[in-house]
Regions:
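Residue-level hotspots at or immediately adjacent to binding/recognition sites across diverse folds
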Residues: 2-386
Length: 386
């Protein structure tokens, strides 16, 4: 659901990575623009995934453990810290702001009374929105339902994400029963954000320091373990000044390919995300501004689809490009032009870069990469002078 959209963006490459990722590593350009660091995993783990790199180089995400559970982590100064859970086995940190406040979702030890598996871990435990501060995990309220999650946090500690209501959505396939809505948390209070038209469900994916929130709304669908989402997002949305703005689309109107969804907004009001193309069979990354509206960012040459996940203050966009076989490459867009990030790294890079999930104001990037042995790890790509 909700935050699992971002997990899809940063983890969807796993199916094709083992077969194709390392073969492509030898094709890098000799031009040096980034030094890549493998941030590794928690002890005993074999997989990690990132979601945000803040302007102090702190990365939020999750790592597997020796028992294959997944725990929220922060990487800081080369050190990985397990943030823990709310008593259950799994958690993910989808966000960290520049003051070090982290947020995400964490399982409790209590079974969901409706048998739902909201966070997709397969445990059917209640999974709550959570903030990690001062070494502890602090749950946030829902909108009357049992589950939710934080996707982003701005500098002032206002969080954006998703939460269930107490109302059932008859369109939701089992095991999901309850509606879920976009939400902002301010001073510990959950504030429901409106969805577009008659859309029953939605989620907030990003928030900037001015309180502008982005996300999407649509209809509940079956949880897809490959896409890690059960929202068919029909409308990409912006919430600002108490007003809902439909950002439009690139021709696709049903959300059946991947959907129309805004993932991030910078402090200049520039929005990035994904939109289905006409016919709703494939999707492209987009950049939206108030002046130019939605623009198609395209793909790497020859690829079939793309997604834009993050944008920094200078307007550099990162995400991924996908070929017809589902293989992915990390992408950076400058001036609307996509470049394979693997062509900009040192030949000694320890990883082939599958996705770019976040970029900070200094241009440092985090995402998923694959090692020579086939493990998928979090990386940090640091710009270097030529």
């Amino acid at each position: 659901m909700k935050s699992r959209v971002v997990s899809f963006l940063c983890a969807m490459s796993l199916m094709a990575a083992i077969a194709t990722g390392m073969a492509a590593q030898a094709q890098q350009s000799p031009t040096l623009h980034y030094a890549v660091v493998d941030l590794g995993t928690l002890p005993g783990g074999t997989f990690s995934q990132p979601f945000v790199i803040n302007d102090n180089d702190v990365v939020s995400g999750s790592s597997s453990l020796a028992n294959n559970n997944q725990n929220a982590v922060l990487w800081e100064h080369g050190r990985i810290t397990n943030l823990g859970t709310l008593g259950g086995p799994n958690s993910i940190a989808f966000a960290v702001n520049d003051l070090g406040l982290a947020g995400g979702e964490a399982e409790t030890s209590t079974s969901d009374p409706n048998g739902e598996d909201f966070c997709g871990f397969g445990t059917h435990l209640i999974c709550l929105p959570v903030l990690w501060l001062g070494g502890g995990a602090h749950p946030l309220p829902t909108l009357g339902g049992n589950n939710g999650g934080v996707n982003r946090i701005n500098l002032w500690g206002i969080a954006a994400g998703v939460a269930e209501t107490a109302s059932e959505d008859p369109a939701c396939p089992a095991p999901q029963k309850l509606q879920f809505k976009p939400v902002a948390w301010e001073f510990g209070r959950a504030i429901a954000l409106p969805t577009e038209g008659s859309d029953p469900d939605g989620l907030a994916m990003g928030i900037n320091d001015y309180g502008q929130v982005v996300g999407g709304s649509g209809i509940c669908t079956a949880f897809n373990p490959n896409l890690l989402i059960n929202l068919q997002s029909v409308h990409a949305l912006l919430w600002q000044n108490g007003r809902l703005v439909d950002l439009g689309n690139l021709g696709g109107t049903t959300g059946q390919a991947l959907g129309n969804l805004a993932y991030a907004i910078n402090n200049r009001g520039q929005v990035v995300g994904v939109s289905d193309l006409s016919g709703d069979t494939t999707f492209h990354a987009f950049l939206w501004t108030a002046a130019t509206k939605m623009q198609d960012l395209g793909t790497l040459p020859g690829d079939a689809a793309s997604l834009a996940i993050s944008i920094n203050e200078p307007g550099v966009v990162v995400g991924l490009s996908i070929d017809a076989s589902g293989n992915t490459r990390a992408v950076v867009w400058r001036g609307g032009v996509p470049t394979d990030l693997n062509t900009l790294v040192q030949p000694s890079s320890p990883l082939y870069l599958l996705t770019s999930c976040s970029i900070n104001a200094r241009g440092e990037i985090t995402g998923l990469g694959i090692t020579a042995s086939g493990e998928v790890h979090t990386y940090r790509a640091i710009p270097i002078q030529d």
